[in-house]
Design a protein with these regions (language model features):
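N-terminal glycine-rich phosphate/adenylate-binding segment common to multiple enzyme folds
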Residues: 22-24
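Conserved N-terminal Rossmann-fold NAD(P) cofactor-binding segment
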Residues: 1-12, 26-27
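C-terminal substrate-binding/catalytic lobe of Rossmann-fold NAD(P)-dependent dehydrogenases
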Residues: 73-79, 88-221
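Structural motif
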Residues: 12-13, 54
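Rossmann-like NAD(P)(H) cofactor-binding subdomain of soluble oxidoreductases
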Residues: 27-93
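Conserved NAD(P)H cofactor-binding loop of Rossmann-fold oxidoreductase domains
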Residues: 18-20
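Conserved beta-strand termini and adjacent loop/short-helix elements that scaffold enzyme active sites
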Residues: 2-4, 83, 112
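Redox-cofactor binding/interface segments in oxidoreductases and associated redox assembly factors
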Residues: 15-16, 57
Length: 221
């Protein structure tokens, strides 16, 4: 095994997970200067060596780090992906599943925006087995009417609850990164909420945030 960043140049996917968990105990933004400084130490070396694969970045604040990597490299932004709210979306599906007593694999739901305190649930898109939650709530209000604010907050604060219990949150985000990596390596055209460069969506451009994306061999399609 090599020990130089340049030896990663032929990889199809490189995952950036550098950080300092102690600085993010209260807020994901706490790692800002640590993680962006670390990114600057290796990202140019990787690209100068000829890297042309996909970057998946976990490090927080996820959207800022992804944006910084894009600024440093000038690389195709579709091939720089932040895990963003992919994990938060899974937590939202879990929160809904517990409330309506349906397997979360049957639920379609996304958290969007910043991977942080301002993220929000895309409620108008939530469905169970393809049927909109709004319609289910009309048909069976006792079972399917949710406190949306409470449910959304459960998803938003999920990572902090895990950290409060064991002072780390590595397994779930590792599984999320692995799932996105699989989508790239197998060219799956997989749908996920992940952090990508905004190019006019909702009037915003030039920075990363999470939207529903299709992920394949060329990154975000």
């Amino acid at each position: 095994y090599g020990t130089q960043y340049e030896q990663l140049a032929d990889c199809d996917v490189v995952i950036n997970a550098a950080g300092d968990v102690k600085t993010s105990a209260k807020d994901r933004d706490g790692e800002l200067f640590v993680t962006t400084d670390i990114a600057r130490t290796w990202i140019s070396r990787l690209f100068n060596a000829g890297f042309h694969g996909v970057i998946i970045t976990i490090s927080n604040p996820c959207d800022v780090v992804a944006t910084e990597i894009w600024h440093i490299t000038g690389y195709n932004p579709r091939k720089i992906i932040g895990t963003g709210t992919a994990l938060d979306s899974a937590r939202l599906r879990n929160a809904i599943a517990k409330r309506v007593n349906v397997d979360q694999k049957s639920i379609g739901a996304y958290m969007l925006g910043e991977h942080g305190n301002s993220q929000f649930a895309y409620w108008s898109n939530v469905n169970i087995a393809g049927k909109p939650l709004t319609q289910l709530a009309q048909d069976n209000p006792q079972r399917f009417t949710l406190d949306e604010d409470e449910t959304e907050q459960d998803a938003r604060r999920g990572g902090y609850r895990v950290y409060a219990g064991k002072e780390c949150t590595e397994y779930a985000i590792a599984a999320t990164a692995a799932r996105l990596t699989q989508a790239v390596l197998c060219d799956e055209h997989y749908a996920a909420a992940c952090s990508t460069l905004l190019t006019g969506e909702q009037g915003e451009s030039g920075n990363y945030a999470s939207l529903p994306c299709i992920v394949g061999a060329n990154g975000v399609e």
